[in-house]
């Protein structure tokens, strides 16, 4: 099953899917 979550690091936010 694929799921995505938001990752924020040092002012950068991006979507990470596994």
From Swiss-Prot:
Disulfide bridges in this chain: 4-17, 8-13
rRNA-binding is among the record's keywords: no
Tissue specificity note: Hemocytes.
UniProt superkingdom: Eukaryota
UniProt family annotation: Belongs to the tachyplesin/polyphemusin family.
Keywords assigned by UniProt, alphabetized: Amidation, Antibiotic, Antimicrobial, Disulfide bond, Secreted
GO cellular component: extracellular region
Protein name as it appears in the record: Polyphemusin-2
GO biological process terms on file: defense response to bacterium
Keyword Isomerase: no
Organism expressing this protein natively: Limulus polyphemus
Main location: secreted
Role of this protein: Significantly inhibits the growth of Gram-negative and Gram-positive bacteria.
Positions of post-translational Arginine amide modification: 18
Protein location: Secreted
């Amino acid at each position: 099953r694929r799921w995505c979550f938001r990752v924020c690091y040092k002012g950068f936010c991006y979507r990470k899917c596994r």
